[in-house]
């Protein structure tokens, strides 16, 4: 059995658990004395067992961010249709992944989903992110505006933080991606972060970001032309479309559309929301709805006819809501601090609950956690309903599973990323030598 195949059984100490039935067989067989006819009565010593195989693909988790002030009992499910996420019940994880048990790793896990895949191509993702950010910094004089944070003396750490965040998003939310697709997805997230940081700072009045200046309505795969300052983005477009002419083009267009949306809404930093529904509708667009759905499909290489999308409309809506609730829960402390110190806008679910119900942040977080659990309940109900449809194709069923894996992956990203955990998280292990943030972790 090859090492890669053995790795798929993820017999990894600490972060992977053996199923109960397999542990029972192992312990029982080890205790049985082995005898041969005519041999002495002294039992033979069992042969030494090889050490558990540690897949070299595993990306170490350094931080654990416990966002809740009070512990809670996770709702118990009699039957879970998401057994494929449970490391106790799934011996073979999806292709290009290993399956991680968050509790065994040491994360303060409170999701009703039992585990999450991690993409084994994280080194390729890191290389792609670093390559892109170095290109952007080298081309600063070409006309595109870059974030203020990348102009400071602490520039290198900011660059590493941006890349680390993009990589952590991609290896958990789009875990089944192969090496080529994870490279494209990582670059797309870096582009979004660069643009978003420009929009949130005074630099947005200085000119266009690297994502602006495109007309997606007339943009075609064979018309990759633009101003010189967009050469870096053009290279990204060519890479994405060469890899996947259909989904690559969709991903690129959704990236540019969101950049245009955020430019328009950057002038509405003080926007208020009269109701929770009004706030949620705003945030669903603000979080790049179409891009996030396309990214899941791109990573999994799943095409479906636009006419099929209404079938998935509700579960995709729940996916976006779940993502924005998780994002708001874990980014609240960071965003609140930036709001106080820099005057940054504060459009956050925790803050909205505080205002609507006149409760302190801890209570608002507990309420949002309950909202998350209810969202997961609705997701399970819709997943079961869809999987029982006789007309659902195999490809459509695979897409649903990829979507659910991304649900769980967003928890893992949010709990362990340096972007959020550096302020309030705790170290759960020393950073390895190849860690991007080794020189900055404290």
Swiss-Prot record:
Effect of a null allele: Impairs the production of aculene or any intermediates.
Gene3D superfamilies, sorted: Farnesyl Diphosphate Synthase
Cofactor requirements of the protein: Mg(2+)
Residues annotated to bind (2E,6E)-farnesyl diphosphate: 419-420
Keywords per UniProt: Lyase, Magnesium, Metal-binding
Record: residues binding Mg(2+) 2: 196
Catalytic activity: (2E,6E)-farnesyl diphosphate = dauca-4,7-diene + diphosphate
Residue positions binding Mg(2+) 3: 327, 331, 335
EC numbers for this chain: 4.2.3.-
Pathway(s) of this molecule: Secondary metabolite biosynthesis
Cofactor binding: number and manner: Binds 3 Mg(2+) ions per monomer.
Chain's role: Terpene cyclase; part of the gene cluster that mediates the biosynthesis of aculenes, a unique type of norsesquiterpenes that contain a nordaucane skeleton linked to an L-proline moiety and are of mixed biosynthetic origin. The pathway begins with the synthesis of dauca-4,7-diene by the terpene cyclase aneC using farnesyl pyrophosphate (FPP) as substrate.
Protein family: Belongs to the terpene synthase family.
Protein name as annotated: Terpene cyclase aneC
């Amino acid at each position: 059995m090859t090492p890669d195949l053995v790795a798929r059984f993820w017999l990894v100490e600490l972060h992977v658990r053996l199923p109960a039935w397999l542990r029972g067989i192992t312990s029982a067989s080890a205790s049985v004395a082995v005898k041969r006819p005519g041999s002495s009565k002294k039992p033979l010593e069992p042969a030494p067992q090889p050490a558990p195989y540690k897949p070299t693909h595993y990306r170490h988790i350094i931080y654990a961010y416990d966002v809740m002030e009070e512990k809670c009992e996770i709702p118990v499910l009699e039957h879970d249709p998401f057994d494929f996420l449970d490391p106790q019940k799934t011996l073979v994880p999806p292709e290009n992944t290993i399956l991680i048990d968050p509790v065994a790793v040491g994360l303060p896990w409170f999701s009703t989903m039992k585990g999450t895949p991690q993409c084994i191509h994280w080194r390729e993702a890191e290389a792609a992110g670093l390559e892109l950010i170095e290109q952007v910094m080298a081309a600063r004089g070409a006309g595109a505006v870059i974030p203020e944070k990348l102009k400071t003396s602490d520039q290198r750490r900011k660059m590493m933080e941006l890349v680390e965040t993009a990589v952590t998003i991609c290896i958990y939310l789009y875990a089944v991606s192969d090496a080529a697709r994870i490279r494209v997805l990582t670059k797309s997230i870096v582009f979004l972060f660069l643009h978003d940081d420009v929009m949130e700072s005074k630099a947005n009045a200085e000119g266009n970001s690297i994502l602006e200046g495109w007309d997606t309505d007339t943009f075609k795969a064979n018309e990759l032309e633009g101003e010189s300052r967009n050469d870096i983005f053009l290279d990204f477009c060519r890479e994405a479309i060469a890899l996947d002419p259909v989904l690559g083009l969709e991903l690129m267009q959704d990236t540019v559309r969101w950049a245009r949306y955020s430019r328009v809404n950057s002038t509405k930093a003080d926007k208020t929301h009269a109701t929770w529904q009004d706030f949620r509708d705003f945030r669903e667009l603000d979080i790049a709805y179409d891009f996030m759905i396309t990214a899941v499909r791109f990573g999994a290489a799943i095409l479906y006819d636009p006419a099929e999308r209404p079938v998935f409309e509700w579960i995709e809506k729940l996916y976006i809501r779940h993502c924005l609730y998780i994002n708001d829960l874990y980014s609240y402390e960071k965003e609140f601090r930036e709001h106080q110190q820099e005057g940054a806008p504060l459009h956050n679910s925790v803050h909205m609950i505080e205002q609507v119900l006149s409760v302190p942040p801890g209570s608002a977080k507990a309420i949002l956690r309950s909202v998350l659990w209810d969202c997961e309940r609705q997701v399970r109900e819709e997943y079961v309903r869809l999987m029982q449809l006789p007309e659902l194709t195999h490809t459509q069923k695979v897409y649903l599973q990829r979507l659910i894996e991304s649900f769980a992956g967003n928890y893992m990203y949010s709990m362990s990323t340096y972007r959020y955990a550096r302020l309030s998280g705790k170290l759960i292990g020393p950073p390895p030598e190849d860690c991007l943030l080794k020189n900055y972790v404290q």
